Amino acid sequence: MQNQQIRIRLKAFDHRLIDQSTQEIVETAKRTGAQVRGPIPLPTRKERYTVLISPHVNKDARDQYEIRTHKRVLDIVQPTDKTVDALMKLDLAAGVEVQISLG
């Protein structure tokens, strides 16, 4: 896999899960002899929802909810075949979305 790069994008609602997953990926890649750039934290997306808790009137009675989506990017430069095999066998947490692209 000469002159290739693997870009891994991670998304999760819990920042502890995403940090743990990135740490596992970095350790696995370094153990197999690849060079790792990152993890690079991307901006956190905050979605806010406002809900009326009153059944009829009284617009002052509201609840506000927020969902935060944390994102990280990792670049693995010049991966070996052992690196790709190790990353495929890696078991990450259930709440983390992983996108892998070759470039």
Curated annotation (Swiss-Prot):
<dbReference type="GO" id="GO:0000049">
    <property type="term" value="F:tRNA binding"/>
</dbReference>
<dbReference type="Pfam" id="PF00338">
    <property type="entry name" value="Ribosomal_S10"/>
</dbReference>
<keyword id="KW-0687">Ribonucleoprotein</keyword>
<keyword id="KW-0689">Ribosomal protein</keyword>
<dbReference type="InterPro" id="IPR018268">
    <property type="entry name" value="Ribosomal_uS10_CS"/>
</dbReference>
<comment type="similarity">
    <text>Belongs to the universal ribosomal protein uS10 family.</text>
</comment>
<comment type="function">
    <text>Involved in the binding of tRNA to the ribosomes.</text>
</comment>
<dbReference type="GO" id="GO:0006412">
    <property type="term" value="P:translation"/>
</dbReference>
<dbReference type="InterPro" id="IPR001848">
    <property type="entry name" value="Ribosomal_uS10"/>
</dbReference>
<dbReference type="GO" id="GO:0005840">
    <property type="term" value="C:ribosome"/>
</dbReference>
<dbReference type="GO" id="GO:0003735">
    <property type="term" value="F:structural constituent of ribosome"/>
</dbReference>
<dbReference type="InterPro" id="IPR027486">
    <property type="entry name" value="Ribosomal_uS10_dom"/>
</dbReference>
<protein>
    <recommendedName>
        <fullName>Small ribosomal subunit protein uS10</fullName>
    </recommendedName>
</protein>
<comment type="subunit">
    <text>Part of the 30S ribosomal subunit.</text>
</comment>
<dbReference type="GO" id="GO:1990904">
    <property type="term" value="C:ribonucleoprotein complex"/>
</dbReference>
<dbReference type="InterPro" id="IPR036838">
    <property type="entry name" value="Ribosomal_uS10_dom_sf"/>
</dbReference>
